[in-house]
From Swiss-Prot:
The lineage of its organism: Bacteria, Pseudomonadati, Campylobacterota, Epsilonproteobacteria, Nautiliales. It comes from Nautilia profundicola (strain ATCC BAA-1463 / DSM 18972 / AmH). 1-deoxy-D-xylulose 5-phosphate binds at residues 112, 132-133, 162, 185, 198, 203-204, 207. This is 1-deoxy-D-xylulose 5-phosphate reductoisomerase. It is an enzyme of class 1 (oxidoreductase). NCBIfam families: Dxr. One of its GO terms (biological process) is isopentenyl diphosphate biosynthetic process, methylerythritol 4-phosphate pathway involved in terpenoid biosynthetic process. HAMAP family: DXP_reductoisom.
């Protein structure tokens, strides 16, 4: 297989599964973490290696290292692997997903932005999500429904949220939250962007939109489960509800995404007696302002590209300490208000609208 984003948390866990099951790694793509990448190259001996830029490429111990987005797309086209694992962060993952689809590859997808930006143009039958929530839904639905929930007696799908690092903070304290505060996730160890997205609840907005495309339904909602051991639930027409429970470890969804069949123990089971009580909370708009647009986003999924672009802009400015944490949500909501009537008819529209939203954000904020 080919692993895009090999030095991030998903990529590292993917290679751990590859190591365990002796899966050949044809290609590695990474950003600028050259030390981890060099160790991966030494162990897995890939045929292709691509990094973000020339500066990083000069530090890579590989005779024919390439750099840049075009090199990633070219590698996908040249590769003989059937499976592409896309664990790139943010918009960098969109074109590789489209290229992999064009080449008829199977895609193990951890890059949320691909479906958020361009879900209507992606054949989800070739995609397996690397995501605890969507994996949980798939696990609950696969036997009974063949994944498409409209074809069986599903009443509603639910995914859970941790609530992020500021979950137990007062509204007044949230206004003063620093980057260091926001990155202290209570349950998961993740990258910077997704940890911020967890704190704003943008991550869960994206996951609802992903679920819409993956499971072909608008009957999807979310709530907070504070221990993050229940990842997804299915509410059935007969009144019963089933839940997917597992530890907070991405190796389980990764294993199912990259292996045709999983019979081994990937994780030890959750000991429910040790867990004790579980706590469920409503996602409050007062604490998570972006939740205000949840229903609108499902009705008008073209807005996904607006939310994503405004969010990426806002996170950049937050990381530069030029805006506050609560400004992230404010910028997103104002962008949605400005571009509410956006209409995407082709993949080129996605990139045009991204540019338009980005320019608007740059001229109106900071």
């Amino acid at each position: 297989m080919v692993v895009l984003g090999s030095t991030g948390s998903i990529g590292v866990n993917t290679l751990e599964i590859a190591r365990r099951y002796d899966i050949e790694i044809e290609g590695l793509v990474a950003g600028n973490n050259y030390e981890v990448l060099n160790a991966q190259i030494k162990e897995f001996k890939p045929k292709y290696v691509v990094v973000k830029d020339l500066k990083t490429a000069e530090k890579i111990d590989f005779p024919n290292v390439k750099y840049g987005e075009e090199a990633v797309l070219d590698m996908i086209e040249k590769s003989k692997s059937d499976l592409i694992v896309n664990a790139l962060v943010g918009d960098a993952g969109l074109r590789p997903t489209l290229k992999a689809q064009e080449c008829g590859k199977k895609i193990a997808l951890a890059n949320k932005e691909s479906l958020v930006n361009a879900g209507k143009f992606i054949d989800t039958s070739k995609i397996t999500p690397i995501d605890s929530e969507h994996f949980g839904l798939w696990y609950l639905l696969i036997e009974k429904c063949r994944v498409k929930s409209e074809k069986c007696n599903v009443k509603k799908l639910y995914i859970t949220a941790s609530g992020g690092a500021l979950r137990d903070w007062s509204l007044e304290d949230i206004k003063k939250a620093t980057l260091k505060d926001v990155l202290k996730h209570p349950n998961w160890s993740m990258g910077v962007k997704i940890t911020i997205d967890s704190a704003t609840m943008v991550n869960k907005l994206f996951e609802l939109l992903e679920a819409k495309w993956l499971f072909d339904t608008d009957k999807i909602d979310a709530f907070i489960e504070t221990k993050s051991i229940i990842h997804a639930l299915v509410e059935w027409q007969d009144g019963s509800t089933t839940a997917h429970i597992s530890k907070t470890d991405m190796k389980l969804p990764i294993a199912f995404a990259v292996l045709d069949e999983v019979n081994d123990e990937i994780l030890s089971p959750v000991n429910l007696l040790e867990v004790g009580g579980l706590e469920f909370r409503k996602i409050e708009v007062e604490k998570y302002p972006v939740w205000e647009i949840k229903d609108l986003l499902l009705i008008k999924p073209d807005l996904g590209v607006v939310v994503n672009t405004a969010n990426e802009f806002a996170i950049e400015k937050f990381l530069e300490e030029r805006i506050s944490f609560i400004d992230i949500s404010g910028i997103i909501l104002k962008a949605v208000q400005k571009f509410e009537n956006v209409n995407i008819n082709g993949i080129d529209d996605v990139f045009e609208i991204k540019n338009e939203v980005r320019k608007w954000c740059e001229s109106n904020f900071v």
